[in-house]
Amino acid sequence: MSGGGVFTDILAAAGRIFEVMVEGHWETVGMLFDSLGKGTMRINRNAY
């Protein structure tokens, strides 16, 4: 892999940062989708 070292390092670093972000925010995202789903269900129930 001659010449592609820097790009590979950047990709690896970006992947690690992304992993940390996903790990940190996963519960928040889950709670968000949970409340979003409940809200959608409530709206659907009221619509009919």
Swiss-Prot record:
UniProt-recorded Gene Ontology molecular function terms: bacteriochlorophyll binding; metal ion binding
GO cellular component entries: chlorosome envelope
Keyword set, alphabetical order: Bacteriochlorophyll, Chlorophyll, Chlorosome, Chromophore, Electron transport, Magnesium, Metal-binding, Photosynthesis, Transport
InterPro entries: Bchl_c-bd, Bchl_C-bd_sf
Statement: the UniProt record of this protein carries the keyword Transport: yes
Location(s) in or outside the cell: Chlorosome, Chlorosome envelope
Any GO BP annotation: photosynthesis
Binding site for a bacteriochlorophyll c: H25
One Pfam family in the UniProt entry: Bac_chlorC
Family the UniProt entry places it in: Belongs to the BChl C/E-binding protein family.
Function: Component of the photosynthetic apparatus. The light harvesting B740 complex binds bacteriochlorophyll c.
Protein name: Bacteriochlorophyll c-binding protein
Organism this protein belongs to: Chlorobaculum thiosulfatiphilum
